[in-house]
């Protein structure tokens, strides 16, 4: 297994709180993005102080209460499974904040981090405020939930999005990249993918590769895996009979998502 595919490594932090993923602890080759996934039982409490990072808490499933000492967001979360395909609630917290997350049911939260040196207001990102977008055509269709797009000034660095891809389709396709700080043509953004698959015994394929091929890994990605994209193209293919969900976290020196398609495959857009 290459260094870009991360399997769940569960660690019980306290009673009722289990750390499932932690890219920083696994020494992922990233400078701007960090990602954790935490399972929380009902009435259990996860707590953290952010330091020099901002954080977006995404309620992947279940319900929780989030507080930062000034704000209390009670019983947030909208779904028992991501494959209900409806937006969820999230909370943005700026650097220097301390927060707690209390399970009001059995829940799973994603903690999406990026460096930040400017404090911004804590904000509840309601499911009803999440932009919904259908992208692509033919076998390149996907449903997108824009939690923190670059048009939303809630965050300093973070970009957060959920993508649903149905059976037999591709996403992040044609292959695109955002690994050069060359605005207005392309921005440099690192990225993580947290994957879920329905039904859960399935898998998807993801290839991460640069133009020089100094990075070139093709992975069979299973339910609950994380894929690291430090640079390069990163398409995802979904086999027949299965559906794909992934949560993307992106960040870089400038908070703009400007990508460039691989020229060899850009022709598919003109069909």
From Swiss-Prot:
Give the UniProt family note. Belongs to the isomerase IolB family.
SUPFAM superfamilies from the xrefs? RmlC-like cupins
Q: What is its EC number?
A: 5.3.1.30
Protein name per the record: 5-deoxy-glucuronate isomerase
Q: Which reaction does it catalyse?
A: 5-deoxy-D-glucuronate = 5-dehydro-2-deoxy-D-gluconate
Q: Which Pfam families match?
A: KduI (PF04962)
Q: Give a GO molecular function annotation for the protein.
A: glucuronate isomerase activity
Its source organism is Shouchella clausii (strain KSM-K16)
Pathway the protein acts in = Polyol metabolism; myo-inositol degradation into acetyl-CoA; acetyl-CoA from myo-inositol: step 4/7
What is a biological process (GO) this protein takes part in?
inositol catabolic process
Q: What does this protein do?
A: Involved in the isomerization of 5-deoxy-glucuronate (5DG) to 5-dehydro-2-deoxy-D-gluconate (DKG or 2-deoxy-5-keto-D-gluconate).
